[in-house]
Structure formats: C-alpha cells, structure tokens
Amino acid sequence: AFGHNDHLGGHTLNLEFVSANPTGPIHIGGTRWAAVGDSMARILQANGAEVVREYYFNDHGEQIDRFAKSLVAAAHHEQVPADGYKGAYIDEIAARVIDEAKADGVDALALPRVRDEQGDEGASEQREEFRKRAVPMMFAEIQDSMKEFRVDFDVWFHENSLYESGEVERAINELREQGDIFEKDGATWFASTKYGDDKDRVIIKSDGHAAYIAGDIAYYLNKRRRADHPCDVAIYMLGADHHGYIGRMMAVCAAFGDTPEVNMQILIGQMVNVMKDGKAVRMSKRAGNVVTIDDLLEAIGVDASRYSLARTDYHQSVDIDLNLLASHTNENPVYYVQYAHARSCNVDRNAEQAGIRIADADLSLLDTPADGEVLAALAMYPNVLQMAGDHRAPHRIAHYLEDLASAYHKWYNAERVVPMELTDPESRLKGEERDALSVAKNPETPRAAARLKLNDAVQHVIAGGLKLLGVSAPDKM
C-alpha cells in the first residue's frame, strides 16, 4: 500500500496496553489506550515491524481480593467495604455468580465466610467461590468490549501464571546471583539504585507476600525471552498515575543487561474528560462515578470514539465533546474525513456513468492550484506514516487526514471530473476567466481522467489512513 515501508523490518515490538484489572468495566482512560494502542500497532506494522498486541491481566493480588469482598457484601445486601468496588455491575456479577454456582449444585451463600476460629474472614471459602467465578466473567466482558472496539489482542497474559510457573522466583534468583538482591527488615529488596532508580525496592514483603514489582520483573523477562515472538522492544502504555513507576521499571531493564529507552519504552497517557452540553459527564449507568467504554460507544459509536481518542497526542489530556462527535458537520473531525472519502466514491460512480476511464488520463494536465495542493498533500503521506511510527504518535495520522480532507474538499468544489456545460452567463465571459472556468467545469477527456485518478489516489490514502486508526471509510453518507 502507498506509504507503507519496511524500515522497522526485523524488529519485534511488544505493545502492552489497556491491561485494566478484571474488577470492573473498562473506564474511559483505558478506552483511550485501546484506541491509541491499537492504532499504534497498525502504524508500526505499516512500517514493517512485527507487533505483538498484549493485554496483561492482573488476576493476582489486592485488587482481586477487594473485588471478591465487594461481591460477597453485595450478595448479602450489605454495604460494600470502603475500599471496595461499587456500581450496579457489582450487584449484577454477584447475582450471576450465585446462579452459576447453583447450576453446579453449590449454594455460594451457605459457604463459610470466615477462614479460622479467630473469625478472620480472610480468604474464606465463600469469598474464594465468588473470586474464582467472577474474575472469568469480568475477563470475558473485557474481551467482548475490546472486540466491539475493533481491538484484537494477540496475547492475553495472566499475571497469576508468572507465580504458578515459578518465573517470579527464577527472575529474583537471577538478580540474586548477580548481586542485585539483599535482605533487610525481614524483607527481600532489589538494589535498583545501582541502575538509576531513586530508591531500592521491596520485592518480597516481610509477611512473605510478593510486592507488585516482583511480577513486573518476571513479566519483562518473559516478554524478552519467551519461546513465541520474544520482543526486542517492550512498550508499556500506562496511565498518568504511573509516572513514578518509570524509574524502577527502567532499573529492571538495565539489571538484565538491556538498554533503557531502547529495549524498554514507557509511554504515559493523560486524562480524558467526557463533555456533554458543555458539562463534564462523570456518571455511568453501570459503574457509578466513572464513564466506561460502553457508555462512550452507546453515545457516539466506534468510529467517532476511536478517532477522537487517537487524534490528540496522548501526552495531553483530551476533552471528548459528545454533542460535536455525534453531529454531521464539518466541525466534527471524523465526519469531515469520512465525508471526503464518501465524496470521492460518489465521484467514481458519476464518472463511471459518464464513461470516463483512468486509462485515458494525461497526468501532466493536473496543473491548477487546487490540483497542486492535493498532490502536495498526497506526497507527504509516506513521511507522515514513518514519523508516526518512529515517534509512537498515531495523532499525526489523524491530523494529516484532516489536512488532506481539507485540500480535497476545496479541490472538489473547484474542479469537476464529470464535465458540465457552462451556463449561458458563464459562456458569455471572455478571455482567461472563461478559459479557467472551462478547464474547471468542462474538462476534456484526458484532463477529466487525470482528475479521476487524483480523486482515486485521495480515496486510497484516506481509506488507508482511517484503517490505521481502526475507523471505517464509508462509500456513502
């Protein structure tokens, strides 16, 4: 395809994005990463890279415990714990767990709610029953949401597997053998300051439980050394609240002999504000005080959602204006670009009826200012695509498409492909004015065919650019 290249050929990039905990629907921040991450994957592939799209599923640790506690409380119609999860979806999932268990001959609510004689409810049988049934339900819901959003992950990686397979222990032992692990205050520490971190990190707490970074250490090693598609670049896409995480992760990269910012790249995305009627939208039908992917899709659909989230540099916060993005106006950027594509398809249909064939084109006749503007815009596409890949910047594709659509709409209004007779007043004009009008409105066959070829080139680039953003290119609107 025009603009595609192989300058990243021979590189395998692991692109991990969204990776929301299986404790609720995907919120608007995760939705932004879904749009940006999948678009970035498509752009990197168009630059010749092999890309592994990966979702890291945090099914180990405290968040899952809080999720299970919340479900048990909801099932008993009790108040959800202060640090628990709230929203109608918690009641829904609790009810589904009870029904599923019942179908399997288990009365979930009758199982013991305490773990020991001291009355510690801990990892009780009942909580474990809710956890083991609810997490796969949430996982399936997340997978369905991603599929509807046109994001296909190659790997769904479960954090738990790193512990079950012994990879966490092996990774820590490897660091220990090279002198990067020490014991202090009953805990096990990673000497990350040796590799530029601002402080050393606990990896096994004094109570014997692994700290969050223990899984991250093993996971990075897994990405680099796995049998199937090991990567030479591991790209992590994280939310704004993870900024403090960069130093420790780069230390992990360096400790294993890799080059920070080369073998590991961390991209930090900023906030998304959803606006309607000039006010911030903070409520969801299902999830309480957060806007979810389903809320956004219901309001404006997949095309407008993906385009609007990918068109702003993820280093900046973005306002999603639901009124604007639902409108059929030139102010709506996704409509403006898609309309250029639909217009070009309509030109094709009219040209076919008029018997104009590209084979008759004389491209030297693309000599008007409007022709020149479109040709110049088309010529920029390969460079834009390469820069978007190198800078991990999908928004460059969106901005380019808007510029190309602008040049095309102007061209469409100035030049005709299918000849049209001059009106009586127009035909009475004299000299250069009449000649210019005649060239614009009533071109001879070689010029009309050349314009048709230019029209089709625009159509091809817009369709290709929209595909990189995961957005459809309608042929009628």
Question: What kind of feature is each model-predicted range?
Answer:
Residues 1-4:
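Short, structured interface segments
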Residues 7-477:
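Non-catalytic interaction-recognition regions
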